Design a protein with these regions (language model features):
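Acetyl-CoA-dependent GNAT
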Residues: 5-8, 16-85, 96-98, 102, ...
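Conserved G/P- and acidic residue-centered "switch" motifs that form tight phosphate/ATP-binding loops
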Residues: 90-92
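Ca2+-coordinating acidic residues in Ca2+-binding motifs
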Residues: 81, 95, 127, 146
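Contiguous, function-dense segments enriched for cysteine-driven chemistry
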Residues: 13
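C-terminal "cap" of GNAT-fold acetyltransferases
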Residues: 109, 113-120, 126, 132-157
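Extreme N-terminal starter segment of soluble prokaryotic enzymes
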Residues: 1-3
């Protein structure tokens, strides 16, 4: 597996991966109307519009793009999706590690994530703590977890 920065021509494939992941993986934890609303939102153009305020990576293997992660400039990992056939194989953990390293270099001392019900355990296993359970403020209210992780401890922590 190789991880590198996203290229502009890959946004359509990333948008497809996002939709497929929501429909196949997240569908176990959310009702169909939420999945329909959530998976319909983002296309390649939406990714391009936010390219200036996000850093993005893809995980690749011989099959092509198998995962995607982004963080914004506010010390938040804002999106991560891993192809259903590559779950629990280290893809998400490796993408998260790359994003965390980037955020640390950006000067962040703590990372925030709004996690789905589906991904909550993954983030907990990677050192994130639940701060609050809330509802996503989209058209369809879906439960999410506001989670944080300290990137490094100083001697007074």
């Amino acid at each position: 597996m190789k991880i590198r920065r996203v290229r502009d021509e890959e946004y359509a494939e990333i948008a497809r991966l996002r939709r497929q992941t929501i429909r196949s993986v997240n569908a176990n934890d959310y009702p169909e109307d939420v999945i329909d609303s959530w998976s319909a939102k983002t296309g390649a153009q939406d990714f391009r519009k936010s390219a200036d305020i996000c850093k993005r990576w893809v995980a690749l293997d011989v099959d092509g793009i198998i995962g995607f992660c982004e963080h914004n400039l506010k010390c938040e990992v804002s999106r991560m999706y891993v192809h259903k056939d590559h779950l629990r194989k280290g893809v998400g953990s490796r993408l998260l590690e790359v994003a965390e390293d980037s955020l640390e270099k950006q000067g962040c001392k703590k990372i925030s994530i709004e996690s789905t019900v589906t991904a909550k355990d993954f983030y907990e296993k990677n050192g994130y703590k639940i701060m609050k359970k809330t509802l996503y403020k989209g058209k369809k209210k879906q439960p999410i977890y506001r989670m944080t992780k300290k990137l490094f401890k100083d001697k007074y922590s």
